[in-house]
């Protein structure tokens, strides 16, 4: 076994721990924040960088995506005397677990002739919407977003409940025109711009086969789940983002409440932001 220290005890690090192959044995996390030392993340102890290297691990994996930060962390590890291999999870920029799962679900939906449109709530600049549009070239895709960032009423709930540090206007660096240019089949897209659920009225008679819910915050996620779930075809899927992450815990709260009410068991996806699948029986 290759004993490994994961440097960076955050959301990314927790997912890297789950993605490590069977040849690797994670001994601990290392982190520069003293407040995390002596705690556990994903059941793995968190130590200072100095303490993490004392057992002489075989390798260190840097749990950050930012290249500048990764360079700083690598220099720190070398300065502490570690001479072994240092891994950078750059492949995760190329291979996307959530997109792969969505494509597999789309293939299954086509094979089983599950009827319904596609949709995404929380479009931002359209990267994932473009993937869905490509996977369902002959189906309508409904796209819901304020296209102006987080609205004040939703952010207020986040702050009052301590769900996140969201700010009004976050993720506002977008526009419908930007998204349209990214879609491979823009003629199949129907845009619903504004604050959800007020923008859902035109879809009350719609049926869905696959819906991506990526609203980040508690209130819009809680509002979206029953509206889309009740309109899913049998075998249809909700793919919900940020459920098992640490940046936006309100989305996870909304999903857990909804699943308890409906008697559902969410199926986790091993992507970087803790997505889950909810499938209609």
Which positions does each model-derived feature cover?
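Hydrophobic, well-ordered beta-alpha structural blocks that scaffold small-molecule cofactor pockets
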Residues: 1-115
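S-adenosylmethionine/decaboxylated-SAM
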Residues: 88-93, 103-107, 111-281
